[in-house]
Amino acid sequence: MLLYRLDIADFRVWVSIGVSEQERHYPQPVLVSLSLFFKEEPKACSTDKVSDSVCYAELVSLIEEVATNNPCALIERLAKVLLEKIEKALAGQVSRIDLRVSKERPPIPDLLSPVSFSISREVP
């Protein structure tokens, strides 16, 4: 059995995010990673046409638009909002979406790595 997956890893978006108003005052970097799963071989595998593919340039543009226009206190909320918009945009094209949102520089002393929240959804 063949499985098909498109991955976009660590797309940086500057967003208004944070628990306090002070934290949300200046845009902060978050990293968005995404895996799209396909039930069948994507048509673009045979045709080599962008029009038959999931255009990842359009997808990252959507991620940036949604993330920058939806200020959130928590990465959990941002992940849910992004997942819903991506699922709607790709209706009928994918069977599963895995999404991870990472706050690149959380304001916690001595925390040296990003904090992440992941969410996955099977798409009917």
From Swiss-Prot:
Entry annotated with the keyword Lyase: yes
GO cellular component, one term: cytoplasm
Enzyme Commission identifier(s): 4.1.2.25
SMART domains listed in its UniProt record: FolB (SM00905)
CDD domains, alphabetized: DHNA_DHNTPE (cd00534)
GO molecular function: dihydroneopterin aldolase activity
Catalytic activity, as annotated: 7,8-dihydroneopterin = 6-hydroxymethyl-7,8-dihydropterin + glycolaldehyde
GO biological-process terms attached to the record: folic acid biosynthetic process; tetrahydrofolate biosynthetic process
Keywords: Folate biosynthesis, Lyase
Catalytic residue positions: K103 (proton donor/acceptor)
Metabolic or biological pathway, per its Swiss-Prot or TrEMBL entry: Cofactor biosynthesis; tetrahydrofolate biosynthesis; 2-amino-4-hydroxy-6-hydroxymethyl-7,8-dihydropteridine diphosphate from 7,8-dihydroneopterin triphosphate: step 3/4
Binding site for substrate: E23, Y56, I75, E76
A Pfam family that the UniProt record links to this protein: FolB
PANTHER family on file: DIHYDRONEOPTERIN ALDOLASE 1-RELATED
Family membership noted in the UniProt record: Belongs to the DHNA family.
Role according to the record: Catalyzes the conversion of 7,8-dihydroneopterin to 6-hydroxymethyl-7,8-dihydropterin.
Protein's UniProt name: Probable dihydroneopterin aldolase
